[in-house]
Amino acid sequence: MEMDMDIIRKAIAATIFALVMAWAWRVLDWAWFTPKRIEKRLRQQGFRGNPYRFLVGDVKESGKMHQEALSNPMEFDNDIVPRLMPHINHTIKTYGRNSFTWMGRIPRIHVMEPELIKEVLTHSSKYQKNFDVHNPLVKFLLTGVGSFEGAKWSKHRRIISPAFTLEKLKSMLPAFAICYHDMLTKWEKLAEKEGSHEVDIFPTFDVLTSDVISKVAFGSTYDEGGKIFRLLKELMDLTIDCMRDVYIPGWSYLPTKRNKRMKEINKEITDMLRFIINKRMKALKAGEPGEDDLLGVLLESNIQEIQKQGNRKDGGMTINDVIEECKLFYFAGQETTGVLLTWTTILLSKHPEWQERAREEVLQAFGKNKPEFERLNHLKYVSMILYEVLRLYPPVIDLTKIIHEDTKLGPYTIPAGTQVMLPTVMLHREKSIWGEDAMEFNPMRFADGVANATKNNVTYLPFSWGPRVCLGQNFALLQAKLGLAMILQRFKFDVAPSYVHAPFTILTVQPQFGSHVIYKKLERQNF
């Protein structure tokens, strides 16, 4: 009997030992052998980069370079790549265009050839979003149709698309105009007292565009929308911290201060949105007409999709899905337009000849009247200026995908588990595409449209390209055109003496040390 127990104990011990060894091997394979195998395959195909460092990869080196780059402002020019992505810039200069870096244990190749870029963006089912390599809590913010793949992405995009048709955008214009009118009227009153008015424009446009989103997304529930925006701003700051860290699986479950706060904010936002959505759904079921805002259009489109699918439970979006899309409306819509208006104002301050050209065009089209949709879309100089600002200061500095199986890309076979980065801010400065003046602000390059400016290459990516091109790009451009036109009708502007040129990236490209601009009322009132 005693011998039997001894055998059992040894068997249990042997089993535990075997399980521990199997687990240790899996961890070692995940953390060391797999990255080294991928590195070997990349090097065999001519890719070059730093050797893999256990778990951290290039994170420490990249972080140090990033800190150094941001510690000092720069001259006012558009050579912002060394400041925004110093480690990528250093790697490409050191190892060439066919190079790779390490995001922890994940290798990331840089793709800069137009034909390969087109291939990546055309085959979105192979080259997918890479949110899975981050802390899962990142998905509290980076969610919705932009983060989905496959059938779920296709269904969500189909349901959401009706909210962004030209007809719907046209109906949003009055709400845009009210928000801009209220802000500019305040500026005029302050400028009348003091002769001019100095504004830190990025936070001002940030709040303004959030007001616009609140109005067009939630209509009559605008006040609740404002509260959601404030919580989302805090969630964005915490999300950025998460994305800068090397993610260790399971870390999101630990009760750290940041993890707890992110979960609290997400619950609060989710509860508020659920209340708004349930109220709308009850009204629709009671036969009341839907509201003509983004949420109203989304809910009606969702009901139609469910009916088309034979009222199947999984035929449309769930309430939770709608909540995630509302978060995306807020974050993407507000951030993109806010930074676009900010950099447009700064660049037009530095190029007064283009400011004057745009103003003359706006005044000829509208005089002092409120801009209207049809003619707004035919403002050639204003459109060219916005395209050029998006080239030099795109909202996001790169598009990064991940592949989950070995994938042929041009002459290369990219190993599964590799990230593929399209460095947008670099591509937008390629002299072979844009000419010798690629670093200069020259809206004339877009006089004959984007295709002509890029020589029909897929190298202009402020809103991505292909099947996953940003649904809201026309929303952002229309709002920016209206805002810029209304500002030009009333003010001349120049950067304040205190302005320091220091672009940096917090999800989007923003001014690091403020964005102070001086506005002076136009003397000419009889247009």
From Swiss-Prot:
Which pathway does it serve? Alkaloid biosynthesis
Q: Name one GO cellular component term.
A: endoplasmic reticulum membrane
Q: Does the record bear Membrane in its keywords? A: yes
- Tell me which residues bind heme: 470
What does this protein need as cofactor? Answer: heme
Q: What happens when the gene is disrupted?
A: Large increases in loganin accumulation.
Give, as one word, the top-level EC class.
oxidoreductase
Q: Cite the ranges annotated as topological domain Lumenal.
A: 1-11
| Record's note on what induces expression | By jasmonic acid (MeJA).
Q: What EC number(s) are associated with this protein in UniProt?
A: 1.14.19.62
Q: Reaction catalysed by this chain? A: loganin + reduced [NADPH--hemoprotein reductase] + O2 = secologanin + oxidized [NADPH--hemoprotein reductase] + 2 H2O + H(+); secologanin + reduced [NADPH--hemoprotein reductase] + O2 = secoxyloganin + oxidized [NADPH--hemoprotein reductase] + H2O + 2 H(+)
Gene3D superfamilies per UniProt: Cytochrome P450
**Function recorded in the entry:** Component of the seco-iridoid and derivatives monoterpenoid indole alkaloids (MIAs, e.g. secologanin) biosynthesis pathway. Catalyzes the conversion of loganin into secologanin. Catalyzes the conversion of secologanin into secoxyloganin.
- Of which family is this protein a member? Belongs to the cytochrome P450 family.
Name used for this protein in its record: Secologanin synthase 2
